[in-house]
Amino acid sequence: MRVKELEEENASLRAVIILKDAKIAQFESKVKELTERLNKNSSNSHEPPSSDGYGKKPAFPKSKGGKQGGQDGHKGGTLLMESNPDVTQPLIPLVCDCGHDISNEPLIVGEQRQVHDIPRPKKEVVAFQQYNVQCPCCGKVNKGQFPAGVNSAVQYGTRIRTLSVLLNTDYKIPVKKISSLLGDLYGITPNEGSIMSNNRRCYEILEPVEHRIKEEIKSSAVAHSDETGVRVEGKLHWLHTTSTLMYTYFYIHAKRGSDAITDACSIIADYPGRLIHDCYESYFKLTKAKHGLCGAHLLRELASQIDDKKAWAQLMSEMLLELLKQAKIDINQNIKNRVFIEKQYDIIISDGKKEEPPPQKSGKRGKYKRSKGLNLLERLEKHKESVLAHAFDPIIPFTNNLAERDLRPSKIKMKVSNTFRSIEGANHHARLAGFTSTLRKQNINVFSTIMDVFDGKEITFAQ
């Protein structure tokens, strides 16, 4: 009888142990997941650098013997002497240290030093005085014609309107601060309505210019696309960009994925070239485009797996970096060895699948839980051509950094202003920001060109 009780007790304890083992495994999985989340930073995930906080390590040189600061071959910007200065102030000694008068002695040219400064800000008021002349022949009174754009008794000129657009769009300064700045510098304080009206007018004039930018991008062999969240009226919207080395296009949409990418505002729905992006799944629904994946994003994801001691991730990371290095030195060597390179790529993926744990049942309905490493491996396998494209074609870049750089200023604007007050204001910013970004890529003076926009002059691009 006692034996039976002990057997029942033993079976009960075994059941408790099995249950606890399952709980422990569940907790260990949760701890691992939370630890991975805490260890995420901009070097091993898609997290932006701003999320690293004060614990971010300094950017020391990655290679031994490397140096910080400006690298060899870096173009400097030393301040140079002007051969024809605006003002020259003579510095002539009148009395010698011994007390003798030397004011009438011959001068010997000595050292010259220059101070480069800006003129003292001053408001300029131009009055257009109309005069009327009566014809002695027919008696008609002929009136002098005001210049185009001079429509009110008192109004702000083109330079002020240009500066307000530039400060708000390109330099991300809020409307109230623009008014304060102009007040401090020039003693004029345009109200919020005037400043926003300048943006709206510039936006309207630039419609055909934006159309030209879109056509240039659509006809390019390689384009970059990306998107980032922005606030419009307090709600999440998405700022999408498609760009090239010479042109930038932005548009605002309420959605991030397919609805936005195939919208009438988008220029990549029928894009036939090579589209570089961050492997966001919606982009692969664009069947007319060939794709290229951002190597920088892949390296960060691989870094996360390397942190978990995954041998396959180390091999894949080294392979991608070696292909990049070889493409810069002699891409023909990569092209010659293409079959071997693709075979090595396949071997790393095959070995990686053996190293990764198989999908685990999570206790919930639906698909089995897969490791992040396995998900990454299958993405690398599925999009092999897009991952390796840069290694065999010199016009295909390794990263999507171009699109990310184009979006970065708008993220700064969100940090400064937090939200766009209206969808109209967001659309104004998108078009104006795309225009100024295009000008800067082509080394065209932004201030002068916006003045030309307001003056009704034709806008021409360098390329």
Residues covered by each model-derived region:
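Short, flexible loop/hinge motifs at secondary-structure junctions
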Residues: M1-S152, M196, S225
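Catalytic center-proximal scaffold of phosphoryl-transfer enzymes
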Residues: I18, N132-Q134, G139-Q463
